[in-house]
């Protein structure tokens, strides 16, 4: 009886080991694809230098997210006041088993529209992955 229990236990460990070995190289966890999270670097902010006090202000953000279609913009953290916009872009790299990524690089092309009233100067700040800040100012007249 003890021998039968021992064989069943060994077979159970063998099945568990085989399943986890099969999942490891595929890049998948037990509950689906794994994802790597990162901050997206912003190359430039396009914003008019002067804005009328009654106009909306459109700030455009450009940069590179990743080398292929498995990279994406996951979320945008922003804090808006009457005098500033503070932004951090978060990306995600998805690793999926048996999934081919498109070969095209993924670019950041994001616009934020801000409605009046706006303070002057209006400061737009982006938090970069290396800890630095990218900042642009717009004069509101």
Question: PLM features: what roles do these ranges have?
Answer:
Residues 139-141:
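Short beta-strand edge segments in extracellular beta-sheet folds
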Residues 1-28:
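Sec-dependent bacterial lipoprotein signal peptides
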Residues 113-117, 123-137:
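Short, exposed beta-strand-loop hairpins at the edges of beta-sheets
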Residues 19-44:
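Bacterial Sec-dependent N-terminal signal peptides
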Residues 61, 83-92:
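Short, aliphatic-rich beta-strand segments
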């Amino acid at each position: 009886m003890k021998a039968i229990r021992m064989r069943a236990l060994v077979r159970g460990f063998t099945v568990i080991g085989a399943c986890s070995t099969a999942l490891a190289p595929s890049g998948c966890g037990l509950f689906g694809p794994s994802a790597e999270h990162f901050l997206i670097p912003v190359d430039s902010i396009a914003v008019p230098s002067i804005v009328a006090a009654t106009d909306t202000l459109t700030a455009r953000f450009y940069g590179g997210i990743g080398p292929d279609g498995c990279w994406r913009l996951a979320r945008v953290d922003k804090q808006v006041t009457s005098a500033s916009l503070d932004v951090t872009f978060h990306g995600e790299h998805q690793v999926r088993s048996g999934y081919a990524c498109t070969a095209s690089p993924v670019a950041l092309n994001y616009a934020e529209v801000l409605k009046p009233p706006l303070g002057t100067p209006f400061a737009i700040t982006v938090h970069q992955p290396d800890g630095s800040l990218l900042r642009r100012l717009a004069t509101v007249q």
